Amino acid sequence: MRLPNAAHESRPWRIHELTHDFRLEDVWELPTPGGPHDFPRLVQEIASGNPSQGSSRVVGALFALRWKIGELLGWDGPDAGLGSRVPTLRDRLPVDLRHAPSGPNFDALPFTSLYLIDDEFAAEIANRTMHGVMHLGWVPDGTGGYHGQMAVYVKPNGLFGTAYMAAIRPFRHLIVYPPIMRQIGRTWRAGTPSASRLVAPT
């Protein structure tokens, strides 16, 4: 479910220290109910997932089209990414986050992990169109449980990047993300013990 940006901005996430010149594109509540210690599992499932294969045929086709266009136009080459076109956000990490675990490697998506702490994970991506950040947080639900929250930050690359992000926004919100959220929920439920829903100890 898509959330107002304030649902992310109102929380004291460490990512705010790194993204002052990025735009918060959107915020999503993830269908991943769990207990206080389940966040590492969520991070691992996101990093090991492949939305182009597990979500829907339409999403798979859109991902395939994007990668093909990127290949033809050179959007995703080595000179378009982190450390070449843009510096990595690891250069902005404060000392404590620099010494924290960076998080898992991604199996399918071209993200690079930035940091992983108890309730927060961030990874970045860069190409000819934009420099982006995916942020995952582990949010209490008010009843003793928790769930994941995902935020997407973007810094478009010039006028072309701004126009590109505006053009794909309706597809992301209406076609791409809803089936991805359902797939995340299915994967989460498949790995959750059916006997209980973990809650914080009282």
Please give the residue ranges for each predicted region:
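Hydrophobic ligand-binding cavity/cleft-lining segments
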Residues: 1-100
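Intrinsically disordered, low-complexity coil segments
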Residues: 51-56, 99, 106-107, 141-143, ...
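Short C-terminal domain-edge/linker segments immediately following a structured domain
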Residues: 59-62, 152-156, 178-186
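Hydrophobic-ligand binding "helix-grip"
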Residues: 98-142
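Short terminal or interdomain "cap/linker" segment that borders an active site or interface and mediates
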Residues: 120-122, 130-133, 142-143, 147, ...
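Beta-strand/loop substructures that line and gate deep hydrophobic ligand-binding cavities in soluble
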Residues: 127-166
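A conserved amphipathic terminal alpha-helix motif
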Residues: 164-195
